[in-house]
Amino acid sequence: MQIPEKYLSSVDNVEEETQILFALSKQKDADLGMLDSKQEQIALTIGNKPIKVKQSLQSLHQSRGSTGSVLWKTSVKVVPWLLQQSWFMNSLTPKTSILELGSGISGLAGILLSPFVGNYVASDKQLYLKKIRENLDQNNASDVEVHELDWKSTPYPKDWTFDFLDYVLFFDCIYNPHLNAHLVSCLASLAERYPGMQCLFAQELRDQETLVDFLERVRPYFEVDLIKMEEINKTSVASSTNLPPANMSLFIMKPYNHEEYMLKALNEAKKCEPTDSAFCVGAVIVQNGKIVSTGYSRERPGNTHAEECAIEKFMLKNPTDSLEGAIMYSTMEPCSKRLSKKVSCTDLIVKQKFSTVVLGSLEPDIFVKCEGVDLLKKAGIVVIEKLTFQDDCLREAVRGHPPKH
């Protein structure tokens, strides 16, 4: 999905940027975002397509947390707008695969989008699946697959029939702070399996703290951009009346390519002079999707460590800039204690307020016992262990050490 850069705003400072969104969103929704919470069946026309949606008001009123039992305004407003955007429609082909999370009972997005793609999967909790199927079938969308996908359990349907995934969609799914961690875990698992996928999500702006919490949790795994719908509409042939209301926002997310950056860190480690008294480690710092610094063990004068070198090089080049929210890639767990009594790399990372540390391997207890991972997590930093690189990283780390007998 190629969106012109001028229509994207990178979400770097979550607090500040969500505050602006909510300040501009003056429209209050008395019905909490539901299209109509009083009718068992809703009839609407989108484009030239008549659609009927059966709701389950009994489930909504009797079952706690049954928010998927009704049709929500966000999908009604945002999906038709997307259908009018060339950058969106040009990305849909007969080979495109889409997974929708938290589809809810209506199946509306699948009804509207499935004619343009090869595979569309609507997913939600087990209790909604039968009703989703009914709504899809009565609206001639029987080709849409329906699968159980509970964010708290399996990250993807076990009986899913295709091997690749282009897009993940979800509409108005960020409403309960207790579910944010599960949603992010699900998204991270999907990104691990399908690193080329992109996520598109629309959200009604109801609770700023809940949205901030979600964005802070998801940013270690994804680059997040706000799509400027109002700016797009200024240059679009579509009528401005089709613009979703100001209290709805649309975001696009792309998984960080952890493998690519870890390979670059491994290449940094290969630059180290071998020694039997220290490790050979490489580090790469990524900020806003770009490499801003690199380092390797003993690159700078003194017994300097890779992470230390990368941070020092950045600060020397950008003395007024901050590394807050950046991602540190290191071929080995950052040190928590140094025999030289210098500040540990773990402390440096915490001080600079990195959001995430991605590791190629844990540190062997050869010189000192390392507690870097525990200390980073205790400081609120996300730690991602890419242990598929462990053998290569450890082999490089002990280059110069005497062979074990």
From Swiss-Prot:
Pfam families registered for this protein in UniProt: dCMP_cyt_deam_1 (PF00383), Methyltransf_16 (PF10294)
GO biological process: nucleobase-containing compound metabolic process; riboflavin biosynthetic process
Sorted UniProt keywords: Cytoplasm, Hydrolase, Metal-binding, Nucleus, Riboflavin biosynthesis, Zinc
Domain of life of the native organism: Eukaryota
E.C. numbers: 3.5.4.26
Positions contributing to Zn(2+) binding: 305, 335, 345
GO-annotated cellular components: cytosol; mitochondrion; nucleus
Cofactors: Zn(2+)
EC top class, as a word: hydrolase
Protein name listed in UniProt: Diaminohydroxyphosphoribosylamino-pyrimidine deaminase
Homology family: Belongs to the cytidine and deoxycytidylate deaminase family.
Cofactor mode of binding and number, as noted: Binds 1 zinc ion.
Localisation per UniProt entry: Cytoplasm; Nucleus
Annotated GO MF terms: diaminohydroxyphosphoribosylaminopyrimidine deaminase activity; metal ion binding; protein methyltransferase activity; S-adenosylmethionine-dependent methyltransferase activity
PROSITE patterns (UniProt xref): CYT_DCMP_DEAMINASES_2
The CMP/dCMP-type deaminase domain, residue ranges: 256-383
Record-annotated active site: 307 (proton donor)
Organism whose genome encodes this protein: Schizosaccharomyces pombe (strain 972 / ATCC 24843) (Fission yeast)
Pathway annotation from the record: Cofactor biosynthesis; riboflavin biosynthesis; 5-amino-6-(D-ribitylamino)uracil from GTP: step 2/4
